[in-house]
Amino acid sequence: MPDKQKGPGRTIGSSILLIKTFIGQQSTVELWDTILARFDAEDREEFSRLTPAGWGSYRLFDSLLRHGAAAVHADPAVFADAFGAFQVEHDTAFLYKMALKFGGPGLMVLETDQLWRRYHNTGHLKVYEMLRNSAKARVADLSGGSPLLCVVVGGFIRKGLELAGASNVAMSHERCVHRGDANCEYAANWD
């Protein structure tokens, strides 16, 4: 479990570095130099010392999502949602995928906070309503991030539920700290 800290939250370095892999799969053209050129000095410095097991700022995470989306000519929200789905597929080991498949969407829902803490050192993701084909979850105590982080989380949850056997997953982000709400809240419905 990540150490909690005061101040703006951070995300695990492997998550930020995975965005580079995702960008590479979006285009046959090498885009990395173009993206690095768009970084400001602070982003370049932080990225140069980032390690998979270290923590990176949400600022860098957001910057890489925005510059990556621009490089592949994608809407940032569409790009962020697709990255969230890519991340859960990439980071979920085969055996865990099988456990999710046999455990069904309910297991995915029960594991949400453990999954959250794997990637973030701030906030908690808790399910507060669970029905047979729907669930609602809340991210509380989030420090930092951006609206694109919220989109990544939605894509991650949606794809995680699909990997767990849910079909026709519909996600909504009903409340958002970046729109002035106290917490972020997500609702998922599936067949």
Task: Pin down the residues of each PLM region.
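N-terminal leader/assembly segments
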Residues: 1-74
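Short terminal or interdomain "cap/linker" segment that borders an active site or interface and mediates
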Residues: 2-20, 117-154, 161-191
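Short alpha-helical "patches" and their helix-cap loops
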Residues: 30-42, 78-82, 110, 168-177
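Short, mixed-charge aromatic SLiMs
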Residues: 41-48, 88-91, 176-187
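Amphipathic interaction/junction segments at domain boundaries or subunit interfaces
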Residues: 50-152, 175
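Short, electropositive, low-hydrophobicity segments enriched in small/polar residues
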Residues: 58-60, 159, 184
